[in-house]
């Protein structure tokens, strides 16, 4: 079985690619691998910057793997070092991480992008936090999004689940 995470070193740059067909959804096992990769990046003095991207051009990531949830994986599973996606709670990470978003970034996928220092989105990229539509809150995004864009816009996105395209994301400073 191939790994859902591919890495490539290019000098001082580490490229990390999420590659889980069909949509790059993240289950607990993938999250743990991502945490190990980003902890290794943090601890490697020769690496200066990481680029996080995803395979394909339709999805960056919809976040949590709902098929894994339907199969019994709990929402509070052990996601490993760094929390969900390996970046949200990684202590001591003092190197920049660039997120190259090449498609849909919803829910936890958007939250992982918000954990990065710089977001670069393809023109066709879209963002949303649809958790509100199922009666939950995008917990990490409720902290991170208002720090990056105007509070009232962040609250609208968090409380409505409205999608925004790359152009609007740029307009608000993402």
Task: Describe these PLM feature segments.
Residues 24, 57-58, 143, 155:
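Glycine-centered loop/turn positions within well-structured domains
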Residues 28-29, 64, 111, 140:
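Generic recognition of short, well-ordered alpha-helical segments
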Residues 1-57, 72:
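Conserved CoA-thioester-binding segment of acyl-CoA-metabolizing enzymes
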Residues 91-174:
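Crotonase-fold acyl-CoA enzyme core
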Residues 16, 52, 65, 112-113, ...:
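Hydrophobic/aromatic residues within transmembrane alpha-helices
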Residues 1-4, 35-39, 82-88, 105, ...:
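A generic local structural motif
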Residues 30-33, 54-92, 133:
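Glycine- (often His-adjacent) and acidic-residue-rich active-site loop
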